[in-house]
Amino acid sequence: EKNFLGRGQALSFSIRTGADDRLYELSFFEPMFLRNDLGLGMNLSLKDTNKQNAAYDTENVMFQPFIIYPLGQKAKLKVDYSVIQTDLSNPGLVGAIVTDEVNEGKITSSSIGYELTNDSRLYKSGQKNGFLLKVGQQFAGLGGDNTGLKTLIMAAAQREAFKEEVKFSAVVEAGVLTYTSGNSRVTDRFFLSSNKMRGFEPGGLGPRECSNKLCGTGTNDALGGENFTVLRLEAEFPFGLPEEYGLSGGIFYDIGNVWSLSKVNDNVLYE
């Protein structure tokens, strides 16, 4: 609901359940807190997985209040406080690294963060032209079980050409995760999912622990990485068919990598 109680507030609640995962999400946003341009919001979520693309179960509970303040027509600043509790349980055939992380039990992370967004894209004929830049960091260590820093950067550009019939886009993303106390877990580290890097199965890129070098049988744990970068290039074009068919074509090229682990052993590959 984008106009909750007729006051311009946004309220969202979603439920997703399946054979191997469960997700509950609740969010609220007040765009005119104290009758000024300061926005106040809150996110609350619970996510469980039951051996989803892995040999163990996970639970993730998150509570995040935040404020958003405009910095002109194109830029805005978001500041948030996050409390996240994660748990790994019910392991099957897993390696030493995941076993150690399961034995840690429930871990609570308490952090404060910011995200700075500058969006110069112009809405034109239903498309967007221009440039988008996002920079964000999360500083963990406010009473939780670990202390560290997570940095994310994204830059995107879109451009229409040939009488606005062809759209070119480029997106580059990067992330760095560092800890000064405690260690990262598989629930913290980066994975290049299909919305970041197309063409690979879940967990198909980056460090993994295998009981044999071919990763064919036995242990085969996707561990994720503490660093990642990816570049996505895409062009969309019409097929020359009538518009009412709603069909268009596209080509894309993605290149990226996820790497780096603070804890490795002889069975870890691609770190």
Give a label for each model feature.
Residues 1-132, 198-199, 205-211:
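Gram-negative/organellar outer-membrane beta-barrel architecture
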Residues 1-4, 265-271:
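Short, intrinsically disordered, charge-balanced linker/junction segments flanking boundaries
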Residues 92-247, 251-269:
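C-terminal outer-membrane beta-barrel translocator/porin domains of Gram-negative envelope proteins
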